[in-house]
Amino acid sequence: MLRFLKPFPLRFGKRFYSKVPPVTNHERILPKQPSFPTAPAQNEIATLTIRNGPIFHGTSFGANRNVSGEAVFTTSPVGYVESLTDPSYKQQILIFTQPLIGNYGVPDCKKRDENGLLRHFESPHIQCAGVVVNDYATKYSHWTAVESLGEWCAREGVAAITGVDTRAIVTFLREQGSSLAKISIGEEYDANDDEAFINPEEVNLVSQVSTREPFFVSGGDGMLNIAVIDCGVKENILRSLVSRGASVTVFPFDYPIQNVASNYDGIFLTNGPGDPTHLTKTVNNLRELMNTYNGPIMGICMGHQLLALSTGAKTIKLKYGNRGHNIPALDIASGNCHITSQNHGYAVDASTLPAEWKATWTNLNDQSNEGIAHVSRPISSVQFHPEARGGPMDTFYLFDNYIKEAIKYQKSRTA
């Protein structure tokens, strides 16, 4: 069971707070997931068709259904469970560059840690629409595994194809850019059927992965209170906060956080899928928040882009995005390079930042922006994922810095 905050009001140090909205939920409330047949469509003929591109034939090992979405690739050698449950991959067709996938199976989706957070998954369900691998491991072995990757995909309604040349697919996407694609199960398919190529980024994908109602996760003594704007939050972001002693209140992406921000020691903006320009209400809320709130604000991934948009800066769509656990990012202030975990198709155009903002991180592969900060206030964000899961832990310290700022702000309010 989740450990949660006591009924309101809350007490922090010498100051008494009682305006936090009464929340009775202790788990995220997500849109209802459709049910699918549980038997995998194994050894069925399957086809990956890239719009205005090549066609690849293989065999299915997932759900017996046709799907479409934006074809993207990840260079992560491990962590397919974490990648597939990352909400930032919502409705995308994910191609793995690692040739062998599925060899350690899938752990129990119901296992939770001492804070009630999912132990092995980044969200309750697979988020991508389809999975593409070169060689699917039909036999798996790991002490935490309870089912195969194919069984999991079938149960979640996710189409999966193996036996295709993923190197050729990635080469095409790298040269031509991310493209719409579809996976068809069975012998009948129409490569020119444009109606089958559905562009998920034409809609607000964040609304499909954000909690419908606020919920609590409590950590440590609960004396530090952080408000999280959920654009598709990964479980390990919440874990990274509560493991540092924070109690976390998670709000829907479009919640008017500016109305309750004074009750919190920090505001946190999470990752999420799709085009950030769809979230005009969230951007307007953040703009108003920064006009009235003096505490620390931190953003990750989508949160980074939304923070930039709220300042008046612009975002751009990358040619094929950055997705993997081995991407170098430069800390401009120190000159140090860190290996980071990333998953995004958009980036902030640093040249459009207002004068009171500065770029703080740069991607060393494509020179895109990886971080911004206000020059005088404790507001900052990064494009990469310091919480990892999977990936390197080089930038874990960014959570420590944020918590230190939240404690500092709390003390200034209770003095």
From Swiss-Prot:
EC primary class: ligase
PROSITE patterns on file: GATASE_TYPE_1
Transit peptide: 1-17
EC number of the protein: 6.3.5.5
Pfam family, one: CPSase_sm_chain
Involved pathway(s): Amino-acid biosynthesis; L-arginine biosynthesis; carbamoyl phosphate from bicarbonate: step 1/1
Entries under SUPFAM superfamilies matching the protein: Carbamoyl phosphate synthetase, small subunit N-terminal domain, Class I glutamine amidotransferase-like
SMART domains: CPSase_sm_chain
GO CC annotation terms, alphabetical: carbamoyl-phosphate synthase complex; cytoplasm; mitochondrion
Active site (UniProt): C301 (nucleophile), H385, E387
Keyword presence, Amino-acid biosynthesis: yes
Residues binding L-glutamine: S88, G272, G274, M302, Q305, N343, G345, Y346
GO MF annotations in UniProt: ATP binding; carbamoyl-phosphate synthase (glutamine-hydrolyzing) activity; glutaminase activity
Location within or outside the cell: Mitochondrion; Cytoplasm
Domain Glutamine amidotransferase type-1: 225-412
Catalytic function, reaction form: hydrogencarbonate + L-glutamine + 2 ATP + H2O = carbamoyl phosphate + L-glutamate + 2 ADP + phosphate + 2 H(+)
Keyword field contains Iron-sulfur: no
GO BP term (any one): L-arginine biosynthetic process
Miscellaneous comment as given in the Swiss-Prot or TrEMBL entry: In S.pombe, this enzyme is synthesized by two pathway-specific (arginine and pyrimidine) genes under separate control. One is linked to the arginine pathway and is designated CPSase A (arg5-arg4), it is localized to mitochondria and repressed by arginine. A second one, CPSase P, is part of a multifunctional protein (ura1) encoding 3 enzymatic activities of the pyrimidine pathway (GATase, CPSase, and ATCase); it is localized to the cytoplasm and feedback inhibited and repressed by pyrimidines.
Record note on quaternary structure: Heterodimer composed of 2 chains; the small (or glutamine) chain promotes the hydrolysis of glutamine to ammonia, which is used by the large (or ammonia) chain to synthesize carbamoyl phosphate.
UniProt cross-references to PANTHER family, sorted A to Z: CARBAMOYL-PHOSPHATE SYNTHASE SMALL CHAIN (PTHR43418:SF7), MULTIFUNCTIONAL TRYPTOPHAN BIOSYNTHESIS PROTEIN-RELATED (PTHR43418)
Family: Belongs to the CarA family.
UniProt-recorded name of the protein: Carbamoyl phosphate synthase arginine-specific small chain
Organism of this sequence: Schizosaccharomyces pombe (strain 972 / ATCC 24843) (Fission yeast)
Taxonomic lineage of the native organism: Eukaryota, Fungi, Dikarya, Ascomycota, Taphrinomycotina
Gene: arg5
